[in-house]
Amino acid sequence: MLQPKRTKYRKMHKGRNDGLAWSGNAVSFGEYGLKATAHGQLTARQIEAARRTISRHVKKGGKMWIRVFPDKPITKKPIEVRMGSGKGNVEYWVAQIQPGRMIYEIEGIPEETAREAFRLAAAKLSVTTTFVTRTVR
């Protein structure tokens, strides 16, 4: 599972996830990409599940890049615990996603294969996505 090796602080404020992705919004490494079209959070488990799906579909061909990293801790209090007594423990890690953010990139495979792999992977993610192709070399 993806998570930071160490952080300055253990817990984080909830914050707001609005606006568009100004960085990480172009196909930079590969030939094809999976781009987010909505706001949301991707958990480390979702990122890994989609990665496995893509890897299984393309088999040995192609190279893949994961363009997001879950660096925000989400806390949760134990079940049947009364309110108060501080913030809960870190339960999992998420990557905050804005519309336009590139999530995965791939190269070295035919477009039909890439399109199908990303379609299968998109079913594992909690944000709506679209398939994009590199425009400028």
Swiss-Prot record:
Entry superkingdom: Bacteria
Gene Ontology CC terms: cytosolic large ribosomal subunit
Entry-linked InterPro entries: Ribosomal_uL16 (IPR047873), Ribosomal_uL16_bact-type (IPR000114), Ribosomal_uL16_CS (IPR020798), Ribosomal_uL16_dom (IPR016180), Ribosomal_uL16_sf (IPR036920)
GO MF annotations in UniProt: rRNA binding; structural constituent of ribosome; tRNA binding
Pfam families to which the protein is assigned, alphabetical: Ribosomal_L16
Cited CDD domains: Ribosomal_L16_L10e
UniProt entry keywords in alphabetical sequence: Ribonucleoprotein, Ribosomal protein, RNA-binding, rRNA-binding, tRNA-binding
Transmembrane segments: none
Biological process per Gene Ontology, one example term: translation
Family according to the record: Belongs to the universal ribosomal protein uL16 family.
Job description of the protein: Binds 23S rRNA and is also seen to make contacts with the A and possibly P site tRNAs.
Subunit structure: Part of the 50S ribosomal subunit.
Protein name: Large ribosomal subunit protein uL16
Taxonomic source organism: Xanthomonas oryzae pv. oryzae (strain KACC10331 / KXO85)
